Amino acid sequence: MPAKKLGDPYKPHRSSIMMITEWKQRMMESIAMDDDISKLLYYNTPDALSRSPLTEDQKIQLASFDPDGDRRRIYPTRYTPNVVMDQRSFIGLGISGFVPQESWRQFSEKYVMGYLYFYILVDNSIMEIDEGQRQDLLLQRIYDLFQDSYDYGMGHIQEGNLTELWEQNNKFGGYALMMRVIDFK
């Protein structure tokens, strides 16, 4: 009697670890499509928010790979791939710290808690805008877009921490916003 052929034993996981690329892409798209954020990133002038809205193509360029690095302002990593010499604003993303939630409880083997990071950096020579500080307004819009969102993980995203951030010998300043997400292991 011939042996019975077994099915493929591999079952793809459906966990937050498997969703990192998709989450980052969705976060970058949400950020780029926001009218205020896109204007604050695209226009380096004090009147950025009163300028005309960007076209959809211009918004897409803010989050798309650009070998020259001239148009991209939203990155799936904390750092930009090139040294920045121009006056610009950036938003970088990070995902980290996924650990079993409340390891002392019985249900912890099914859930993990981790953090989504938003790194907001603005050249210190273009921080001042007509409505206040560019980095503060970027922070407010990102917080508003993602706080209590149900688009990532199994629950809603909550603020976890906010830290001031300075890079490149204080040429760029801004914030590191950490938001907590809970998902299946």
Each model region followed by its residue ranges:
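"Short basic amphipathic alpha-helical interaction patches in structured regions
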Residues: 106-113, 130-139
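Short, solvent-exposed beta-strand/turn "edge" segments of beta-rich domains on protein surfaces
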Residues: 84, 103-111, 168-172
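Acidic-leaning, charged glycine-interspersed low-complexity segments
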Residues: 89, 133-185
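Hydrophobic residues positioned within well-ordered beta-strands of beta-sheet architectures
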Residues: 91, 114-118, 175-177
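Short, cysteine-centered beta-strand-loop-beta hairpins and adjacent loop/turn segments enriched
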Residues: 100-106, 123-128, 184-185
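Small/polar-rich, solvent-exposed N-terminal microdomains that initiate assembly or binding
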Residues: 1-104
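Short acidic, glycine/tyrosine-flanked loop/strand segments centered on an H-E-D-like triad
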Residues: 111-128
